[in-house]
């Protein structure tokens, strides 16, 4: 009968596991292993049987392999060392080596592609298409100034512009208005203009200038006539009107500067005088306010040195000189005139009337709401007659070409007759602020037409001799739409400035356009600022006393 035999149990009273190693397991070699090891070998007792070092540790167990590097705490700290793990600073050559290598590879690849393209045989039609493509590409690069470089180092860096007047430490900022906020303003409660007085005499526009082309250009003459650029408070007519009507007074040039200020780039300033409840907008004596800027709004405006022929100030003086001469040369000088009821208020008794420029002054009045009564002195430069004999007033201005190689310009002698739209588009881009001011002045004066003359240098390096290449005529309302000039926004800007000035105390203030930011600021000026001598101060005090007496 089978019986159960209990196995021999080795009891270890002092711990776990067997008391002794069985005889069959004595002297048996053993290597620590892990269950996650790959099973790709039978045995490897030495670890040095592989010739290729890449496979040394591929199939060997890593169990316990790092025990020799284990740290055991001991009283002796001499074996402990700190290792510097900071990265080595690369030299400029090492940093740019990869980028230069990639650029060289691209350049070599482009050369190989170009060589391969030149060696292949193309049919005549394909060759013609490729020549046309290259020609158009060069044309666009020249016209729009395309840069093929990855950086912009080749472009001229814009210099910081100077302020039109130095801001002193004792001037206090009363208000600051940024252009994005002004561009959103609208004002539509503007009454129709009312003519108060008309002064001066106008000469007839010579229509022969409308037939001038680049093939029969006409030299620009130097005409010695007197142009009066009188500020608001020095105008005797405005002084007389201020006693009976109006509470805001200005000239059309000053108002156009404010109404179109969001297009301006250069710095300008306007003096504001608060006398009682009346406001006078003036310009400073001996300032550059009446100079015409050139390429002010271009992407790369002229930035030559002061002594250079094409410095901003020299170009502005040249443009003003051209504008004065052309506005008189295109008239029938010394012949029939259109005379207004009142004479020119700025002609002195000892001055010959024929030496005074053809200009008429129209004093007009607008109502801006119930509290603003605006009186403005506007100007006309000439007049024309229609088929039925009706009289049309004209404002005459001039665009001048100084060097077509700059400011992405086009050659007028090649494009003016065939592509006049491209010429006016380029001028609108480079002289947006100047064209907007001229259009605004024509709208304020009520002129039926705006005449633009195209005048160029005889040679790009000679700023003393010029030729007339053509003329162009616009209606101010239509031209305002073409140049995207919104009169609602212009009136809104003016109303905003007037409201701010109405809240100021009596005194003298300055509206200054920041030379390098799209911001205009209003500063309060101490007494006596911008006063040339004591006589000017006495005249201002007498004027203030007269206005206060009328108000009382």
Curated annotation (Swiss-Prot):
- UniProt subcellular location: Cytoplasm
- GO biological process assignments: cap-dependent translational initiation; formation of cytoplasmic translation initiation complex; translational initiation
Record InterPro entries: eIF3d (IPR007783)
Residue ranges for the region (RNA gate) are 288-302
Q: Can you name a GO cellular component term?
A: eukaryotic 43S preinitiation complex
Question: Where do the record's region annotations for Disordered lie?
Answer: 526-552
- The residue ranges flagged as biased composition, category Acidic residues, are 532-552
Pfam families reported in the protein's UniProt record: eIF-3_zeta
* Top-level taxon in the UniProt lineage: Eukaryota
Annotated keywords? Cytoplasm, Initiation factor, Protein biosynthesis, RNA-binding
Has keyword Cytoplasm?
Answer: yes
Record GO terms (molecular function)? mRNA cap binding; RNA binding; translation initiation factor activity
Tell me, what does this protein do in biology? mRNA cap-binding component of the eukaryotic translation initiation factor 3 (eIF-3) complex, which is involved in protein synthesis of a specialized repertoire of mRNAs and, together with other initiation factors, stimulates binding of mRNA and methionyl-tRNAi to the 40S ribosome. The eIF-3 complex specifically targets and initiates translation of a subset of mRNAs involved in cell proliferation. In the eIF-3 complex, eif3d specifically recognizes and binds the 7-methylguanosine cap of a subset of mRNAs.
Subunit structure comment from the entry: Component of the eukaryotic translation initiation factor 3 (eIF-3) complex, which is composed of 13 subunits: eif3a, eif3b, eif3c, eif3d, eif3e, eif3f, eif3g, eif3h, eif3i, eif3j, eif3k, eif3l and eif3m.
The record's comment on protein family reads: Belongs to the eIF-3 subunit D family.
Q: Which HAMAP family match?
A: eIF3d
Question: What does the entry's domain section say?
Answer: The RNA gate region regulates mRNA cap recognition to prevent promiscuous mRNA-binding before assembly of eif3d into the full eukaryotic translation initiation factor 3 (eIF-3) complex.
Spell out the protein name for this chain: Eukaryotic translation initiation factor 3 subunit D
Native species of this protein? Xenopus tropicalis
Q: What is the lineage of its organism?
A: Eukaryota, Metazoa, Chordata, Craniata, Vertebrata
Name the encoding gene, please: eif3d
